[in-house]
Every structure is written in C-alpha cells, then in structure tokens.
C-alpha cells in the first residue's frame, strides 16, 4: 500500500494567527493559537500535492482518514518537560562543549570557564544547558569513559548546586547514569540510542526524557559520501521505527524529542531539504530539536561571506526554524539568538 505523509505549511503568526484561528480559517500548531497553518503538503515516495485545509474533505476516503489522523496529532498540545515550555516557540538549548576538539569551540570552556559560561548561557535565557565531554564532529574518535567523565563531572556538580537544568550530550550509558544521579534532566544521545546497548535500559530505569537523534554512520565516517533514497522521508521512517523500538523496550512516556541531525551524515543538499521541509516532522507528535548553530552548511551556503562564528547564518537558520514551528533550538550564541527572536516576535504583534 502506498504510504502518505502530511506536512503542514503556510504558517501565520502572532496577532494575525490568533484572529485566523478564532475565525476557523487556520489550525493551531500544538494547540498554540500564536502559530497556525492553512495548507498541507501530502507527500509520497513519488508524488507531492499542496492543498488548502478546506480541500481535505475532497480527498479519497482512505487518504482523508490518514490526513485527519495526522492533523489530530499536529494540533494536539505537547506537555512541558525538562524545563521546556512548549507554549513558546522556540525554546533554547545552550551548548556547553567541555572538549578540546569540538568543531567551533574546542578547548575554550574547560574547568571554571565551563561553569561560568553555563551560568551566562542560562542567565541569557537558555531553557536548558547541553553539556558534552566528547566531540562528535566529523572524523572525531571515541574517547574512554574515564576521560569523558573527568571533563564534565565537576561542572555537572556545580550546576546541580545552582539548580541549572542540564541536558547531557553523551553516547555512553555509564556516563548517562552518573549524570542522572547529578540531576541531569535530559539525555541527548547523537547515536540514536544505538552506540551503547545499555542506553535504553538506563533511560527506562530512570524514566528520563531523551532525544532520538538521526545519524548516518558514526562521527568518524558519517560525512563519507552520505546517501539517501529520499532524505526527508527516509529520516521520517527512521523516527517511526525508533518510536516503535522504545515502546517495545517498555518506555511508555512521551517525553521524547526528535532531532534529524543536521550535519550528521548529510551533505549540503540533504541539510537544506531537511531544514526547509522540517514541518513534516510535526506529524510524529513530538517536539523537534534542531542544531544548526555554526554548522558547516552555513559556510557552504555563504562561501566567501563565511566567518569564524557564523553568527549571521546561525541566526538566519534559527529564525527560519522558528517560523516552521520548531520547538527547540540548540545554539551556541544564546544571547544573540534570543535577541533576534524577541525582535521577530515583537514585530509580529502589529
């Protein structure tokens, strides 16, 4: 049987969105009347069709049932967790790399500098701080558990005392368990829960929120000519299978975040397709996390206008994601991104 996918599009925002929802001309995303839509794109492996929501009633019966089912998921409210407020768009995950070799800030925030930077990110408006002790940049190698833990444990302990919400960026179940005992609120495993076969048991044991991240290959090999039949639909199907996997393994809660993994086993075309069509993933019913900050695709697009921090491209991609209803943005330059969001939202009020 042919499989169809539903992508919401043509969004409206702020006061205009509120008015349109009240007049039943648009549908709210996640029950939030400040962002709504009036068109959907129906996709399959060999076709796509853009229609107004009023045209849904004219679809063939089976397809109409599928679309209506998807829309119920898309318009349903998402419950808050891990200090995220999904009534707001977008939430901010501040990046703290306690590594000597991360792609943009390796070695910059070790020891006391890391703790102080985390406080700065939180005071600037981060909902949560994503702490990592192992680089997963392209061509990076796995490090020993002891080394990874030694890089992060002191900072985790100090942040716990200050009650700063922490996300732990790790692939290793032992690190996860130690972090959870120090108050970690979210597990962010870039391997898609497949690096360590004990990960799923730790997540279940402590009933912790977690991300399902997409990556093709591993950090050392992921950029060696990545290929997909259809990058958008392949990754959507991947998430569906991963949800089945975690349910099969006894995880019943819905405190799950999906991250399509920009730059993790994708070339420029793949990344652009994923970001530009990101609203497809709303039909999975879980918050979407995007990490585009300072990524290489910004350099590939900007070419001779590239800069070390890639701040302009990071802000531009963050605002685009916000306009597509992405619930969480993983960013390095928290203050600047939040400033851009505040200005954007203020302009929407009129």
Where are these regions (language model features)?
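Active-site-adjacent loop and "lid" segments of alpha/beta metabolic enzymes
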Residues: 1-23, 33, 103-111, 117, ...
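Short acidic/polar active-site loop segments enriched in Thr and Asp
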Residues: 127, 185, 252, 327-328
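Phosphate/pyrophosphate-binding loops at sites that engage ATP/ADP/AMP, CoA/4′-phosphopantetheine
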Residues: 242-255
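Conserved beta-strand positions in the central sheet of alpha/beta enzyme cores
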Residues: 41, 63-68, 128-130, 167, ...
């Amino acid at each position: 049987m042919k499989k169809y996918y539903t992508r919401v599009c043509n969004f409206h925002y702020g006061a205009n969105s509120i008015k349109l929802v009240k007049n039943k001309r648009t549908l709210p995303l996640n029950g939030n009347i400040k962002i709504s839509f009036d068109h959907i794109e129906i996709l399959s492996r060999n076709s796509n069709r853009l229609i107004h929501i009023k045209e849904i009633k004219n679809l063939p019966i089976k397809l109409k049932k599928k679309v209506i089912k998807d829309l119920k998921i898309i318009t349903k409210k998402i419950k808050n967790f891990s200090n995220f407020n999904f009534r707001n768009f977008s939430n901010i995950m501040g990046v703290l790399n306690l590594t000597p070799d991360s792609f943009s800030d390796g070695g910059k925030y070790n020891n006391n500098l890391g703790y102080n930077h985390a406080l700065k990110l939180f005071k600037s408006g981060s909902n949560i701080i994503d702490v990592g002790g192992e680089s997963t940049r392209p061509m990076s190698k796995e490090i020993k558990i002891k080394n990874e833990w030694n890089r992060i444990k002191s900072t985790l302990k100090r942040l716990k005392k200050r009650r700063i919400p922490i996300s732990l960026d790790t692939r290793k179940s032992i690190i996860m368990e130690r972090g959870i005992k120090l108050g970690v609120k979210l597990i962010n495993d870039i391997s898609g829960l497949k690096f360590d076969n004990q990960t799923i048991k730790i997540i279940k044991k402590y009933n912790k929120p977690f991300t399902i991240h997409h990556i093709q290959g591993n950090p050392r090999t992921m950029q060696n000519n990545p290929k997909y039949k259809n990058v958008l639909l392949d990754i959507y199907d991947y998430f569906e299978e991963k949800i089945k996997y975690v349910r099969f393994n006894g995880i019943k809660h819905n405190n799950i975040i999906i991250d399509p993994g920009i730059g993790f086993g994708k070339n420029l075309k793949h990344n652009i397709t994923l970001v530009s069509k990101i609203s497809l993933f709303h039909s999975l019913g879980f918050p979407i996390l995007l990490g585009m900050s300072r990524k290489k695709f910004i350099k590939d697009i900007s070419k001779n206008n590239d800069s070390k921090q890639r701040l302009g491209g990071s802000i531009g991609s963050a605002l685009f994601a916000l306009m597509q209803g992405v619930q969480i943005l993983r960013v390095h330059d928290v203050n600047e991104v939040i400033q851009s969001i505040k200005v954007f939202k203020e302009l929407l009020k009129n």
